């Protein structure tokens, strides 16, 4: 997860007229009997709570949707597209042991979704893994990981942490822990929120990729802050809006958030990947797929 979700803006998103999809049957019925659209001054926080918690009504709504990105073949496709942006490969299972400092202020970035020492998710991963597997090869670095959390510092991590990470990445239990943390923090909340918003498979991937890159945060540059701004521009399909118009608005807000942090940033994972799929009308994210990220072309037949 990149620091944009945590540090671009420390203030919460607050607006006088923002919108959040709520289950059908509430005041203000939506088009076609789906979720309605409701005004809220804290839509980002409410959306985050809704995506990360369980309610019987939301569970029924999500269960009524097609599997979408949660279908095994589509989930595999999602990991491949994500890996093309995170690690310039489609072979995402070869990236458990990847670790580097990209010089972006996030400290070390590692593993299958780019867990970062500076953005808390790598610390949370190692803490959870150590609870289940005490004495693992990364456990001794927990004090240092806690100290550097929120910074780009390597203090207490060098020189051995990168080698320890690569070694632990050969352990099946740590690979499973990375996948479980990916699903818990990023994949499952993103897909759930997308289904509550009435989005199809492409929209679910758009949410997932943004959740990984921007973090599950409600600041203007975090996932829920980006979603909130997009909903103000174009209502969600679940609230009666058009799916393509909403996704275009979401991607535009996300692109602006990236450029607000770094005006020279490469936005190709948005422009020549997700936007390409959208403008081709591929709302179900069906193969064959061709896209470009960071100047490299990828294809899935």
PLM region descriptions:
Residues 2-169, 177-197, 202-301:
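Cell-wall polysaccharide-cleaving catalytic domain and substrate-binding groove, primarily
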Residues 174:
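Donor-sugar nucleotide-binding helix/loop cap in glycosyltransferases
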């Amino acid at each position: 997860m990149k620091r944009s979700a945590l540090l671009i803006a420390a203030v919460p998103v607050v607006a006088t007229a923002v919108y959040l999809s709520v289950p059908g049957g509430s005041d203000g019925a939506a088009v076609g009997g789906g979720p309605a659209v409701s005004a809220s001054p804290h839509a980002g926080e409410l959306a985050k709570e809704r995506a990360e918690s369980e309610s019987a009504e939301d569970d029924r709504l999500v269960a009524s949707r097609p599997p979408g990105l949660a279908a095994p073949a589509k989930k595999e496709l999602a990991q491949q597209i994500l890996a093309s942006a995170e690690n310039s490969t489609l072979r995402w299972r070869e990236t458990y042991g990847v670790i580097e400092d990209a010089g972006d202020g996030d400290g070390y970035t590692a593993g299958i979704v780019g867990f970062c020492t500076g953005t808390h998710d790598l610390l949370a991963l190692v803490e959870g893994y150590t609870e289940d597997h005490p004495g693992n090869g990364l456990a001794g670095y927990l004090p240092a990981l806690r100290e550097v959390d929120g910074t780009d510092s390597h203090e207490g991590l060098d020189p051995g942490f990168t080698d320890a990470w690569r070694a632990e990445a050969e352990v099946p239990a740590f690979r499973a822990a990375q996948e479980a943390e990916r699903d818990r923090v990023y994949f499952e909340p993103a897909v759930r929120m997308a289904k509550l918003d009435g989005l199809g498979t492409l929209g679910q991937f758009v949410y997932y990729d943004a959740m990984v890159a921007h973090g599950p945060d409600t600041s203007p540059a975090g996932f829920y802050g980006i979603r909130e701004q997009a909903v103000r521009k174009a209502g969600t399909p679940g609230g009666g809006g058009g799916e393509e118009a909403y996704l275009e608005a979401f991607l535009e807000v996300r692109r602006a958030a990236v450029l607000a942090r770094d005006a020279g940033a490469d936005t190709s994972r948005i422009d020549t990947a997700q936007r390409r799929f959208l403008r081709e009308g591929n709302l179900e994210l069906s193969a064959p797929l061709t896209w470009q990220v960071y100047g490299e072309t990828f294809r899935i037949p």
